[in-house]
Curated annotation (Swiss-Prot):
GTP binds at D16, H17, G18, K19, S20, T21, N132, K133, I134, D135. It comes from Mycoplasma genitalium (strain ATCC 33530 / DSM 19775 / NCTC 10195 / G37). This is Elongation factor 4. It is a peripheral membrane protein. Keywords: Cell membrane, GTP-binding, Hydrolase, Membrane, Nucleotide-binding, Protein biosynthesis. It comes from the Bacteria. Pfam families: EFG_C, GTP_EFTU, GTP_EFTU_D2, LepA_C.
Length: 598
């Protein structure tokens, strides 16, 4: 295929605006694709994506399109819409020349729409605005056009109108893609230069790499070098996705495809790396994409300690397909060996935990998530803490700083007052208020990340009846009056349950934490005191009463002294159990603790 007939583009949008459905419609227009094979969310290949109805992983496919008897090759990359997976979008854009910016006509522009539009502008990509769901009764097409005009400065009559579900406007959209998105500029005769934008682990092939070839040509048996790791491998097989894996003899400049090279050393493959010929020492690496740092950290521990080695192997494999995931090994006094992982948000954390349990057959306990605090010690040294249990004693701390994020909330006018109150309750600092269109506003607050990772998003959705959308980005670190609250069960500190809270909210949260633990931990044969402490001071307490075994049930009649003897024996046994007995924590304990504190 000549380069002038190739188009590389992504579909970007806010979550649930119809990206995957539009991808399905474009697939139907591909020559040679059998419609009987089509199913909803065709490009969402993970079971968890289909169950949740969201896209988690980017997916690249090749489409053969015929327009006016001219053949074209589309390389479409379907991207996620949730704020936690912005890094997947940034990787997709590095492999494209243009994007379709999709907006739901019933919901209008939302937080992630604006964020994704800015990402495309930063990458100097051609943006085609598309309004979806135009056949819905509550579609507000004119207002959505006005919003897109204000955001991008585009002419209203140039905006594509489609209904992906009803297959309306798709032919016109395809013609617009051909007319507006430029073809790739690479040259086949130049030395090989390709961007590795995604990868995953196959138990038979090793690491399978997804690449965009910018210059040159890649063939089976070619030797290639990863610039960052300086590793050399020989290509075993290569091809494209249609969306099924198809083998090819070569990939050339402008193509988006995959290759396998028997790569078993997982650390040799880094997403964002540049691939060149093995003897090429002069080609400079591509810009790749911006590395995104984790926002929250959480410990994952196997329920059965014998699964620890399996967890280590699973983490090594899963990180290949998730460039934003970070982890290190750690030990908890209460939960044993595990890994401490860095995630981009709570949804990212839930997805990784669920993938580990499903794909690698592990049963895991997750500790409450935490953010990274910067601690200035009295000796002048500054340290970073992502685990509350590692916070030094108060006497050794001069100051603690916590991360603040800039939060953008798009919402209808009628919920503005309630959402402002919510932000204030979460220690928000007002920044700005702007009008999106006649009925919608965008407010901006500076908020502590540690406050919003728990229940802020759920409360926002509840207050706004689901109409508010949220996006956030790291802003800075600010000094705060924070305290470490430690939880003791049966007078033993449980390090995995420690948390850091602002001193104004410490008592209230500790009290609710203890109450929840009392509800979640099953009764034992001995009484269990639950205490929340700051330093040596107990600030909250609950008690789980002992379950009573009826030791005198087997007696009938007889001397009362026999009954007393059995009751005294039970009393002594419970005293011993209380001294040496261990408290069994249920697997679902920590996930329930993360839910709304009200």
């Amino acid at each position: 295929m000549e380069q002038k007939n190739i188009r590389n583009f992504s579909i970007i949008a806010h979550i649930d605006h119809g990206k995957s459905t539009l991808s399905d419609r474009l697939l139907e227009h591909s020559l040679g694709f059998e419609k009987r094979l089509l199913q909803a969310q065709m490009l969402d290949t993970m079971e968890i994506e289909r169950e949740r109805g969201i896209t988690i992983k980017l997916n690249a496919v090749e489409l053969k399109i015929n327009v006016d008897n001219n053949n074209y090759l589309f390389h479409l990359i379907d991207t996620p819409g949730h704020v936690d997976f912005t890094y997947e979008v940034s990787r997709s854009l590095a492999a494209c020349e243009g994007v379709l910016l999709l907006v739901d006509a019933t919901q209008g522009i939302q937080a992630q729409t604006i964020s994704n539009a800015y990402l495309a502008l930063e990458n100097n990509l051609e943006i085609i605005p598309v309004i979806n769901k135009i056949d819905m009764d509550n579609a507000d097409i004119e207002t959505t056009k006005d919003s897109l005009h204000n955001l991008l400065g585009v002419e209203k009559n140039s905006i594509c109108l489609v209904s992906a579900k009803a297959n309306l406007g798709i032919d016109q959209l395809i013609q617009t893609i051909i007319a507006k998105i430029p073809p790739p500029k690479g040259e086949i005769n130049r030395p090989l230069k390709a961007l590795l934008f995604d990868s995953y682990y196959d138990p038979y092939k090793g690491v399978v790499c997804f690449i965009r070839v910018f210059d040159g040509c890649l063939k089976v048996n070619d030797k290639v070098r990863f610039i960052k790791s300086n590793s050399v491998y020989q290509i075993v097989e290569l091809g494209v996705k249609t969306p099924f894996f198809e083998k090819r003899d070569q990939l050339q400049a402008g193509d988006v495809g995959w290759f396998s090279a028997g790569i078993k050393k997982l650390r040799d493959v880094g997403v964002g790396d540049t691939i060149v010929s093995f003897d090429d020492q002069f080609t400079k690496p591509l810009a790749g994409y911006k590395k995104i740092l984790p926002m929250i950290y959480c410990g994952l521990y196997p329920v059965d300690n014998s699964d620890y080695q399996n967890l280590k192997l699973a983490m090594e494999k899963i990180i290949i397909s998730d460039a934003a995931l970070e982890y290190e090994y750690e030990t908890s006094q209460a939960l044993g060996f595990g890994v401490r992982c860095g995630f981009l948000g709570l949804l990212h954390m839930d997805v990784i935990k669920e993938r580990l349990e499903r794909e690698y057959n592990l049963k895991l306990i997750s500790a409450p998530p935490s953010v990274v605090y910067k601690v200035l010690l009295t000796n002048g040294k500054e340290i970073s803490i992502d685990n509350p249990s590692l916070l030094p004693e108060r006497s050794k701390i001069k100051a603690i700083s916590e991360p603040f994020v800039k939060v953008f909330i798009d919402l209808p006018d009628q919920y503005l007052g309630s959402v402002i109150d919510l932000c204030q309750n979460f220690r928000g600092q007002y920044e700005s208020l702007n009008e999106i269109d006649i009925n919608r506003k965008r407010i901006c607050y500076l908020m502590p990340l540690g406050e919003i990772i728990y229940s802020f998003f759920d409360k926002l959705k509840s207050i706004s009846k689901g109409y508010a959308s949220l996006n956030y980005e790291f802003y800075n670190y600010q000094h705060s009056q924070l305290e470490k609250v430690e939880i003791m069960l049966n007078k033993q500190k449980i390090d995995a349950l420690s948390f850091i809270s602002h001193k104004d909210f410490a008592f209230k949260r500790a009290k609710k934490f203890c109450t929840k633990l009392k509800e979640l931990i099953p009764k034992h044969l001995f009484e269990i005191p639950i205490q929340a402490t700051i330093g040596s001071k107990v600030i909250a307490r609950e008690t789980i009463k002992a379950v009573r075994k009826d030791v005198i049930a087997k007696l009938y009649g007889g001397d009362v002294s026999r009954k007393k003897k059995l009751l005294e024996k039970q009393k002594e046994g419970k005293k011993r159990l209380k001294a040496v007995g261990s408290v069994q924590l249920p697997q679902e304990l920590f996930s329930h603790l993360l839910k709304d504190e009200d």
